[in-house]
A protein has these predicted regions:
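N-terminal Sec/SRP start-transfer signal
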Residues: 1-11, 22, 27, 290, ...
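Hydrophobic, regular-secondary-structure patches
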Residues: 11, 15-85, 91-114, 220
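Short helix-loop junctions at transmembrane helix boundaries
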Residues: 294, 309-354, 365-374
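Hydrophobic alpha-helical transmembrane segments of multi-pass inner-membrane transport and secretion
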Residues: 1-19, 243-278, 301-310, 358-362
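Short acidic/glycine-enriched loop/turn elements at secondary-structure junctions
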Residues: 63, 72-165, 190-192
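Basic-flanked hydrophobic alpha-helices used for secretion and membrane insertion
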Residues: 120, 133-225
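Peri-transmembrane interface segments
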Residues: 1-2, 207-262, 271-273, 282, ...
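Transmembrane alpha-helical interface segments in multi-pass membrane proteins
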Residues: 269, 278-322
Length: 379
């Protein structure tokens, strides 16, 4: 019973940690990703006309539509250079207050193509040695002119160049902070050379809107030439990987639980040998082989299920304590969270209980049949 309880407790804790990590990732995505994202079904760029945009805005639940133009480019400043990911946005991005809470220094504005300012990830800001006090020498941004590259070799005529000053520093998460520069949309169009084209249209919903319902309405409006993704679908591979890892952990722990159930197997086997005389007395009293078999199977289930209940109770208490007090630290400097995240799901307890019942039932079959054979001398 003790071994089963320990395995069940460990399984509940591990599954709760995976749930917590998934919940944390989703919360992190909510910080910088839109509720819905409109992409072209087969092209790198997408463009919606004024009629389409007006029709989308009329859908209940849609608060903002943010056109964005994204691509990688090179920035240079003070003999330093870095490949970053530019994200061009218009005034609707600022109107939606996106990433405003993540500003740790500076002012939340972008300017325009004539005098461009940018919201810069803190990693980019520090690695490039940027400063708000510098108002003379802007940061240079370079991007290859693909049309010229097809006809000429790489030289200064095949590179587009723009300049900007930092207006604010953003701190979101490491990968975002180390590569993101948010710039005015018109500035980004000039750098990339694709006026009117967008990487995506990002939709922010009102608080009471259902993302799946709005998604279906947008898809119905735009047709098959466009793809509409929810926030989870934008990170489908990562979330799927977490679920697969959780499944494999469950299977591995179930296998370990199966090994631990050998203690139940031997305990019941010894009980059969020890109670041989008592079993024959039961036979003399008229017990049938089927009744005896059920008795030992039921005994095995009681022992294992008692251990499972104790294990689930201990797992619940320890998970609750970690959730409330952060007992086990994450151990990563400058992490967004200090302790391992925990999120308990009722289905984890249910499937753990099912796994315990199935495994222990199988482990009880041989001792139960052995008891019947020894008592009734069945070969």
């Amino acid at each position: 019973m003790i071994s089963v309880g320990i395995e069940v407790m460990a399984l509940i804790l591990i599954l709760s940690v995976f749930n917590g990590l998934e919940d944390f990732q989703k919360g992190l995505f909510k910080t910088f990703d839109p509720d819905l994202r409109i992409l072209s079904a087969d092209q790198q760029r997408v463009s919606l006309n004024a009629t389409q945009l007006a029709s989308i805005r009329s859908i209940p639940g849609i608060a903002f539509i943010n056109p964005v133009l994204e691509d990688q480019g090179l920035i240079r400043f003070d003999q330093k250079q870095l490949v970053v990911r530019f994200k061009g946005v218009d005034s609707s991005f600022l109107a939606a207050n996106r990433l405003k809470k993540q500003v740790v220094e500076g002012e939340y504005f972008l300017g325009d193509s004539a005098q461009a300012f940018a919201l810069v990830g803190i990693g980019v800001f520090l690695n490039m040695g940027m400063s708000f006090e510098n108002t003379v020498e802007p940061i240079q941004a370079w991007y290859p002119d693909h049309n010229r590259l097809r006809r000429f070799s790489l030289n200064e005529n095949t590179i587009r160049s723009q300049a900007f000053f930092p207006s604010a520093v953003l701190e979101v998460e490491q990968s975002f902070d180390n590569q993101t520069v948010i710039v005015p949309l018109t500035w980004m169009e000039s750098l990339v050379g694709t006026p009117g084209m967008r990487s995506a249209y990002e939709i922010m919903l009102s608080a009471d809107a259902n993302d799946l319902q709005v998604k279906e309405k947008v898809k119905e409006l735009l047709g098959k030439d466009y793809t509409v993704q929810t926030r989870d679908e934008q990170h489908a591979l990562l979330l799927k990987a977490i679920k697969i890892e959780k499944l494999f952990v469950f299977l591995i722990m179930a296998f370990v639980m199966g090994i631990a159930s050998f203690t139940l197997f031997y305990a019941l086997s010894l009980l059969v040998i020890e109670k041989r005389k008592d079993l024959r007395s039961l036979m003399a009293m008229g017990i049938s082989p089927k009744q005896l078999l059920k008795s030992f199977l039921f005994l095995g289930l009681i022992i294992s299920f008692s251990g499972a209940m104790v294990g689930m109770l201990l797992g619940f208490v320890m998970a609750w304590a970690q959730q409330q007090f952060g007992i086990v630290p994450l151990g990563i400097p400058n992490a967004l969270i200090d302790a391992y995240p925990i999120q308990m799901h009722a289905m984890d307890f249910f499937w753990t209980a099912i796994a315990v019942i199935v495994i222990t039932f199988i482990a009880s079959i041989f001792p139960a049949r052995k008891a019947v054979q020894m008592t009734f001398k069945i070969k």
